[in-house]
A protein has these predicted regions:
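A Rossmann-like FAD-binding core segment of flavoenzymes
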Residues: 24-127, 190, 197, 201-203, ...
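FAD-site-proximal beta/loop scaffold in flavoenzymes
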Residues: 1-3, 89-163, 169
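Mid-to-C-terminal Rossmann-like scaffold of FAD/NAD(P)H-dependent oxidoreductases
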Residues: 42-44, 55, 66-68, 104, ...
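Rossmann-like NAD(P)H-binding beta-loop-alpha module
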Residues: 1-36, 40-41, 148
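Glycine/Thr-rich phosphate-binding loops of Rossmann-like dinucleotide-binding domains
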Residues: 15-16, 21, 105-107, 119, ...
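Thr-Gly-centered strand-to-loop micro-motif
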Residues: 8, 15, 39-40, 118-120, ...
């Protein structure tokens, strides 16, 4: 267990693993390029999770761009620039890099098959998950969208139903996402920020966990 772990990336993986080491006794510093953590989720959830994790002892450096990582003996030095353009440094025993994932398509022979990829290396598909090669379909982590097992499973079912002559449909807004920190964070549907951007009328409702009997009984009232 490292004494000090520097996490580059305040997304799902970085926070999940960072919070594990935090509970194991490490000092954890999260360095994030965006101005909030879990940027793909609702802003209210992001603020609440950051507040809870900060209370647990996790440190956050937001709007900070990492430019270099160097091994220095038994420690690792991270060089970055903050939102003021000033150079800042962080030193820890280990660095966890979690700045996103890319589709793993190496060795699939897509070039030989003539299957087209987009600018991010993902397989291009239409609404039926069909590639530009009519008899080849793609699902899961190699196409656009969240890299989630239950999303891939739903897409596999859709393709099977299409091949069986049916006309299925996936509503991606109904696919939930979960961050397994403590406490956990979950979301489904459009975020408040997305609704604002799209000009959709909406109402906001909040219910504090501390008002829930089970939460009070278990002593877990954050959220």
């Amino acid at each position: 267990v490292p004494k000090h772990l520097v996490v580059i990336g305040g997304g799902v993986i970085g926070l999940e693993l960072g919070s594990v080491y935090l509970r194991l006794g490490s000092q954890v510093t999260v360095v994030e390029f965006m101005d909030k953590i879990i940027s793909g989720m609702d802003g209210a959830l992001s603020k609440e999770l950051q507040k809870v994790l900060r209370k647990q002892g996790m440190k956050f450096e937001l709007s900070t761009a990492v430019s270099a990582v160097e091994r220095n003996g038994d420690s690792v030095k991270v060089t970055a620039k903050n939102k003021k353009g000033e150079e800042v440094n962080f030193e820890g025993d280990y660095v966890l890099v979690s700045v996103g994932r890319r589709p793993y398509t190496d060795g699939l022979g897509l070039e030989k098959a003539g299957v087209e990829l987009d600018e991010r290396g993902r397989v291009k598909t239409n609404d039926h998950l069909q590639t530009n090669v009519s008899n080849i379909y793609a699902i899961g982590d190699v196409i656009k969208g969240a890299m989630l097992a239950h999303k891939a499973e739903e897409e596999g079912t859709l393709v099977a139903e299409i091949l069986a002559g049916q006309k299925p449909h996936i509503n991606y807004n109904l696919i939930p996402g979960v961050v397994y920190t403590w406490p956990e964070v979950a979301g489904v549907g459009k975020t408040e920020e997305q609704l604002k951007e799209e000009g959709v009328a909406y109402k906001v409702g909040n219910f504090p966990m501390r008002a829930l009997g089970r939460s009070r009984a278990s002593g877990d009232t954050d959220g």
